[in-house]
Amino acid sequence: MRSQPHVLGIVLAGGEGKRLYPLTADRAKPAVPFGGAYRLIDFVLSNLVNAGYLRICVLTQYKSHSLDRHISQTWRLSGFAGEYITPVPAQQRLGPRWYTGSADAILQSLNLVYDEDPEYIVVFGADHVYRMDPEQMVQHHIESGAGVTVAGIRVPRSEAFAFGCIDSDESGRITQFLEKPAHPPGTPDDPNSTFASMGNYVFTTKVLVDAIRADSENSDSDHDMGGDIIPALVAAGEASVYDFKDNVVPGATDRDRGYWRDVGTLDAFYDAHMDLVSVHPIFNLYNRRWPIRGATENLAPAKFVKGGLAQESVVGAGSILSAATVRNSVLSSNVMIEDGATVEGSVLMPGVRIGKGAVVRRAILDKNVVVGDGEIIGVDLERDRERFAVSQGGVVAIGKGVWI
């Protein structure tokens, strides 16, 4: 039986998420609720835990209180055999300054690496929606002999200009790492597709530590993992690509295999929710063999009264629909929709209240938003723009606790 390598997980969760405003006005991006029962960070943590990686440091910074609390309450491990998932705010170990970039966050947290002394380090982002078995990527990294392995997802070449792109040879060695190039490269076996970086990396520990320390002495660096560390290791011939399509997750369907979404904008966040609601969803939340774990609340079941109806929708625990109609929507816990109200193509976070006869269409309502009787949202975008944020795609976004 092959012994498992000693692996430390580092999750980069300090993102500010300006493009998701107003959802990030009062919380870090990885703490934004998603899918009716989760926060964005639950996807990466579920992937790591399902793979058996139970020593994980989550590096936090921006408005991190709700994120730190969620990790501490939801992701408590037994502590048996040194298992832990711990939030690590900026410690200012190297002087009175906060993290200046993702690489600097790791630099300021190298004491955690030295304490754990792992053979390999997985460095994953905290704000993508997907399933992945990181163990398969680690094994690929070991077999490749590279210093760093970058997860790449195949995207149409015509759309790849929006991503950090990977140019690799037939052996998988990365020859160029290009940030949003005007002319993206093809993959070795398909000129019409491009490897886009998923922001997930596996490092041999010494390679990461040496690269982080060298970068810290470069005054011209932005101290960013994707912008500085990876290109430097590509130039040194130390980087390889891991093809995400080769990752086989137990219980995945043909429809959701290979699903990965960057939800960094309001439109992308909205679209990812719409991927959840069909009879055969593009992303299946109900895979019991590779579960996504979230906070467990002691709530009553959802209730539908006086002919309340929900079609092609996700409805969270504790929610009540009273003579209301919900279509193609995701409702989190404790949502109340009153008589005669209509909700279509919308995302409602915990504690939202929709008054009698109100209409909500193509909208994202943050926690504890109250929509008064007869109010109309998402129908007249010109009027909505005077009151709320409206995305390029016409999605109305209303921040936490707003009364309308």
UniProtKB/Swiss-Prot annotation:
Keywords: ATP-binding, Carbohydrate metabolism, Glycogen biosynthesis, Glycogen metabolism, Nucleotide-binding, Nucleotidyltransferase, Transferase. Pathway: Glycan biosynthesis; glycogen biosynthesis. GO terms for biological process: glycogen biosynthetic process. It is an enzyme of class 2 (transferase). GO terms for molecular function: ATP binding; glucose-1-phosphate adenylyltransferase activity. Transmembrane segments: none annotated. It catalyses: alpha-D-glucose 1-phosphate + ATP + H(+) = ADP-alpha-D-glucose + diphosphate. Pfam families: Hexapep_GlmU, NTP_transferase. Alpha-D-glucose 1-phosphate binds at residues 99, 164, 179-180, 197. Its EC number is 2.7.7.27. HAMAP family: GlgC. Involved in the biosynthesis of ADP-glucose, a building block required for the elongation reactions to produce glycogen. Catalyzes the reaction between ATP and alpha-D-glucose 1-phosphate (G1P) to produce pyrophosphate and ADP-Glc. Belongs to the bacterial/plant glucose-1-phosphate adenylyltransferase family. Homotetramer. This is Glucose-1-phosphate adenylyltransferase.
